[in-house]
Amino acid sequence: MGANIVGVDFSEEAIQTAKSLNEELGLNAQFCCCNIYDAPIMLKGQKFDIVYTSYGVVNWLPDLIQWGQVLSQMLKDGGKFVIVEFHPVLWMFDENFSQVRYAYSRKEPYIVEESTYTDSENDNRQKTVTWNHGLAVVLNGLLNNDLQVQSFGEYDYSPFNLFGNMAAEKNGTFKVAGKNGEIPLLFSVVAVKPSK
């Protein structure tokens, strides 16, 4: 038996890395490189018992109502959606966590253009477009698509040293140094598509 697993990412490099790990571990997962909004079509209407989303996904998505619609389309009746994601409060601060620089939630994207290490030769610039969605936007993306929230959690730690200046904890997680758990860094949601 076993689970049928399909991974979706918009990055071909991430998909190639996942395929290599899949082969190395002797697993039988499949992978699809596409925009998440196109996933129901690209996966030919497949439905799943569980759809899981983890760290660093929501900030790339402009429309969370459409995202919730995709999740609902991809879940079987009675299926669960699980997300563990960086908290929107985290993205309000500068990299030193010393001052608030960005909005908690806004419809307009943040657009950052950065020079690459070869900028002086070819004027190479990389544009990054992200959104900071507040928790109400995330939850309404689910609720407006008939997904029922079963649990919600907030956590004051991160699995990664996001900005290079976070304090390492004994359990391998990271917290904002000097803030003693004052800033939420992660949130989690479990939502279910009702059975008909």
List the predicted regions and their residue ranges.
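Class I SAM-dependent methyltransferase SAM/SAH-binding core
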Residues: M1-I41
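Short alpha-helix
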Residues: T118, T128-F152
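A short SAM/SAH-binding and catalytic strip from SAM-dependent methyltransferases
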Residues: D49-I65
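A short glycine-rich, Lys/Arg-flanked "PGG" loop and its adjoining helix->strand segment in the class I
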Residues: I65-K80
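A short acidic, Gly/Pro-enriched loop at the edge of an enzyme's catalytic core
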Residues: I41-V51
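Acceptor-substrate binding/catalytic loop of class I
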Residues: E85-N96, E121-V137
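Conserved class I S-adenosyl-L-methionine
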Residues: K80-S115
